[in-house]
Swiss-Prot record:
Lineage top rank: taxon: Bacteria
Gene3D superfamilies, per the entry: 3.30.1360.200, 3.30.70.3400, Multidrug efflux transporter AcrB transmembrane domain
Gene: secD
Localisation: Cell inner membrane
Protein name: Protein translocase subunit SecD
Family: Belongs to the SecD/SecF family. SecD subfamily.
Any GO BP annotation: protein targeting
GO-annotated molecular function: protein-transporting ATPase activity
Length: 533
C-alpha cells in the first residue's frame, strides 16, 4: 500500500510539473506573479513553423592568421627601428610567411636573438645570401599559434555575430557552432532577411591610416602606389544633392589604430547638413593612443577606413583628446544604425562566407503547423479508437498514458529550451506509435497469462515483468540512434532527433510505470476480480 501511494504521488507530481511548464505556451496572459517563481518560457518554434531565416556560415579562419602575420610584420619593423637594425624591407608573403630583406650578414646575426626573445610566435624558416650581398630571411607563424588564432577566430566570430543579432532585435535566435569552422544561425520571424545578412556578414574592420604624402594623381590613375602605400576606394556624398560618388586615395600601409578600442558607437545627426554620422567612444587606452596619434600628425590627413573603404580623411587641425571620434560619409539613417551596431558588437576577426541560406515565410510556417497538427490529430484519434475497441478498458488506460506521454514531450521541449520543428512533429508521431507498441506488448503478455488460468494480479505482474525488458531494449537502442542524429545531424534531422529522444524517455515512464500504477490501484485498492483487456 505504502509503495503504491508513493508511486501514485510521483505520477501526480510529474503531471503537475508538466502542466506548469506548458502554461506559458498555451495561456496568453500569465497570472500576476507567475514569472517570479514559475517557468515563463514557451515552446520555441523552428523556422519551418513560424517563418524566418536559416544560415550556415563558414569562418575563414586562415584569413585571421594572415592578419596576424601582417601585424607581426609591422611589429618587426618597429622592433628593428627600436634596436637600430638596418633592413631593406619586411613584408608578409604567402598565407602567413614573413620575408625580411637585410643589407648584409651582420644584421642576420642581430635579428636571431631578437626574434627568439620578442616574437615567440614566429618560427625561423631559412636565411639565404643573395648574389648582390643582401640576405633574405624567411619567417613563418608557428603551428601552435596558427591553431590558436584559428580557434580564437571561430569563437570570437560566434560571439560577435551573437552580439550583433542581439542588438538587431531578433527574439529567440539560435546561434551555435557547427563542425570545426562553421556557425549555424537561425533567426525566427525576421522581417528583413537581406539586412540581417549584411549585418552578420560585415567584417567591420575599422582602421585609422595616414594619407600618403607626395603621391601624384598620375600614380593613382595608373594604379601604381609607391612602396609602403596602397590605393583605397573613397566614398563621397554631395551635401546638396546627396549624390554618391567614388574616387581613389593612397594611404600608408601602417595602421595607426584599429577598432578594438571602441567602447560605444551611436548614431548622431548633423543638424547643419541634415545627415547621419557615427560617434565613437574609445576606452582609456584607446583615448591615449588616439591623442598621441593626432598630436604627432597635426596638419596631416588621417583616413578612417572601414572594411577597405575610406569614408573620410580629415586634416588633423590639433591634438584630439577625450577619447572621441566621428565617422562621416554617405550614410542613410539605416546604414548609420547598422554601422553603429557592428562597431559596438566588435569586428569579426575574419571574413565569413555564407554556405547555405534559406528563408521561410510566416504563411508557409502557419500552413505547416496546421497540416502537422491535423495529421497528428487524425493519427491520434485513429490510435485511441483502435485501443478502445481492441483492448476495451485496457485501451482507456493506454490512451491516458498516451495523453500523458504527449504532455511530457511538450513540457520537456519547453523546460529544456528545445526547438519544435516540422520534423519534430514527425518525431512526436513516431513516439506515439512506439508508445502504443509498448502497451500492445504488455497487454498481449497479460492475455497469454490469463489464458493459462492465472489470477488478474498474477497475470499483470508476469505480463509486465516479461514485457519490460523488451520495451526497454527497443526504446534504449532507438534513443542511442537518436542521440547520434542529435550530435552529428543538422537542421531538420536535429529537430526530429530532439523530439524522438524526449518522447522515448517519456514513453518508458508512461508505458511501464504509469499504466502499472493504474492497474495496481484497481486490483489492490478497488479489488476488481477481472481485467478487461
Amino acid at each position: 500500500m505504502s509503495n503504491l501511494k508513493w508511486r501514485a504521488l510521483l505520477v501526480v507530481v510529474v503531471l503537475i510539473v508538466g502542466v506548469v511548464y506548458l502554461v506559458p505556451t498555451f495561456v496568453s496572459t500569465l497570472p500576476p506573479g507567475w514569472s517570479k517563481f514559475l517557468p515563463k518560457d514557451k515552446i520555441r518554434l523552428g523556422l519551418d513553423l513560424q517563418g524566418g531565416m536559416h544560415l550556415i556560415l563558414e569562418v575563414e579562419a586562415d584569413q585571421a592568421v594572415s592578419n596576424t602575420a601582417t601585424r607581426l610584420a609591422e611589429d618587426l619593423k618597429d622592433a628593428f627601428r627600436k634596436e637600430k637594425i638596418a633592413f631593406n624591407k619586411i613584408d608578409k608573403t604567402g598565407k602567413w610567411d614573413i620575408e625580411v630583406q637585410l643589407p648584409g650578414t651582420e644584421q642576420q646575426s642581430q635579428i636571431g636573438p631578437l626574434v627568439e626573445k620578442e616574437f615567440p610566435t614566429l618560427k625561423w624558416v631559412s636565411a639565404e645570401t643573395q648574389p648582390e650581398g643582401t640576405v633574405k630571411v624567411m619567417l613563418t607563424v608557428h603551428e601552435k599559434e596558427v591553431e590558436r588564432v584559428q580557434k580564437a577566430a571561430i569563437a570570437q566570430g560566434l560571439e560577435t555575430i551573437r552580439n550583433r543579432i542581439d542588438q538587431f532585435g531578433v527574439s529567440e535566435p539560435d546561434i551555435r557552432p557547427q563542425g570545426e569552422d562553421r556557425i549555424l544561425v537561425q533567426l525566427p520571424g525576421i522581417q528583413d532577411p537581406q539586412r540581417a545578412v549584411e549585418l552578420i556578414g560585415k567584417t567591420a574592420q575599422l582602421e585609422f591610416k595616414l594619407v600618403a604624402e607626395g603621391v601624384s594623381p598620375q600614380d593613382v590613375k595608373s594604379g601604381k602606389a609607391p612602396a609602403g602605400t596602397k590605393i583605397y576606394p573613397m566614398k563621397h556624398t554631395d551635401r546638396t544633392t546627396r549624390q554618391r560618388t567614388e574616387s581613389q586615395i593612397v594611404l600608408n600601409d601602417r595602421t595607426l589604430m584599429s577598432g578594438e578600442y571602441i567602447t560605444n558607437a551611436q548614431v548622431e545627426i548633423d543638424r547643419q547638413h541634415s545627415s547621419s554620422y557615427v560617434a565613437l567612444d574609445f576606452d582609456a587606452q584607446g583615448a591615449k593612443l588616439f591623442e598621441k596619434i593626432t598630436e604627432a600628425n597635426v596638419k596631416k590627413q588621417l583616413a578612417i577606413v572601414l572594411d577597405g573603404v575610406v569614408y573620410s580623411a580629415p586634416v588633423i587641425q590639433e591634438t584630439i583628446g577625450g577619447g572621441k571620434a566621428t565617422i562621416t560619409g554617405s550614410f542613410t539613417d539605416q546604414e548609420a544604425r547598422d554601422l553603429a551596431i557592428v562597431l559596438r558588437a566588435g569586428a569579426l576577426p575574419a571574413p565569413v562566407k555564407i554556405l547555405e541560406q534559406r528563408t521561410v515565410g510566416p504563411s508557409l510556417g502557419a500552413d505547416s503547423i496546421n497540416k502537422g497538427v491535423l495529421a497528428s490529430i487524425v493519427g491520434g484519434i485513429g490510435t485511441i479508437l483502435f485501443m478502445l475497441i481492441y483492448y476495451r478498458f485496457g485501451g482507456v488506460v493506454a490512451d491516458l498514458a498516451l495523453a500523458l506521454n504527449v504532455l511530457l514531450v511538450l513540457a520537456g521541449m519547453a523546460a529544456f529550451g528545445f526547438t519544435l520543428t516540422l520534423p519534430g512533429i514527425a518525431g512526436i508521431a513516431l513516439t506515439i506509435g512506439m508508445a502504443v507498441d509498448a502497451n500492445v506488448l504488455i497487454y498481449e503478455r497479460i492475455r497469454e497469462e490469463l489464458r493459462l488460468g492465472k489470477t488478474p494480479r498474477a497475470a499483470l505482474e508476469t505480463g509486465y515483468d516479461r514485457a519490460t525488458l523488451t520495451i526497454l531494449d527497443a526504446n534504449v537502442t532507438t534513443i542511442i540512434a537518436a542521440l547520434v542524429l542529435l550530435q552529428f545531424g543538422t537542421g531538420p534531422v536535429r529537430g526530429f532527433a530532439v523530439t524522438l529522444t524526449v518522447g522515448l524517455a517519456a514513453n518508458m515512464f508512461t508505458a511501464i510505470f504509469v499504466t502499472r500504477v493504474i492497474f495496481d490501484y484497481l486490483l489492490v485498492q478497488r479489488r476488481i476480480k477481472t481485467l478487461s483487456i
